[in-house]
A protein has these predicted regions:
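Contiguous interface-forming segments/domains that mediate binding rather than catalysis
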Residues: 111, 165-167
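C-terminal edge-of-domain segments
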Residues: 150-158, 165
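Short, hydrophobic/π-rich interface segment
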Residues: 103-139, 143, 156-158
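N-terminal non-globular leader segments, chiefly Sec-dependent signal peptides
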Residues: 1, 93-112
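Short Gly/Ser/Thr- and Asp/Glu-enriched loop/turn motifs at secondary-structure junctions
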Residues: 144-149
Length: 167
């Protein structure tokens, strides 16, 4: 069976924004104050608490521009936070809605047609494993079922390479 991990936005992307960098549209992030649930941070994968400042910006979780490189608004704590590390466990922010879109992408970062499905939260790990068990799927996105905003990525857990011991 395919083992999976839930992957947050890379720390290098978050640090660039925390340090005054620009978003995917070459704009500075906007700062707003959270009014409570509904502002999931894509770096720590936790909801941003009411009263905390957050950054809103355009994000493109793909390595290059191409027709399938969806770009959309996401949130990030304004103050640096630790990147989500319990990758084998479904992140807390994915328990705040009844369902999400789960969709597979190929090695060349294109949507694999027929894989996108509005998926109940309890079924996300199983559907992610099912998709990643296919040879044509390189990774999976979890996106908002209401607004299509990127939430996190699901990757296969790769087996460690056996080190030569010299024995």
């Amino acid at each position: 069976m395919t083992a999976i991990r839930f992957v947050a936005m890379p720390t290098t992307d978050a640090e660039r924004l925390w340090n005054g960098g620009r978003d995917a549209y070459d704009r500075l992030p906007e700062t707003i104050v959270s009014d409570g649930p509904g502002h999931p941070c894509r770096h720590c994968l936790q909801n941003i608490d009411a009263g905390q400042e957050l950054l809103v910006f355009a994000y493109r979780p793909f390595p290059e521009l191409q027709p399938y490189a969806e770009t959309g608004p996401i949130f990030l704590h304004k103050q640096p936070c630790a990147r989500y590390a319990a990758e084998e466990i479904m992140p807390p922010m994915l328990t705040t809605s009844r369902d999400f879109i789960v969709r597979g992408y190929s090695e060349n970062d294109r949507i694999v047609y027929g894989t996108g499905a509005v998926t109940e939260i309890g079924d996300i790990p199983a559907y992610g494993k099912e998709l990643l068990g296919r040879s044509d799927i390189a990774y999976v996105h979890v996106r908002s079922a209401r607004n299509n905003c990127f939430q996190c990525r699901i990757d296969k857990v790769k087996a460690p390479v056996l080190a030569e011991t010299g024995a």
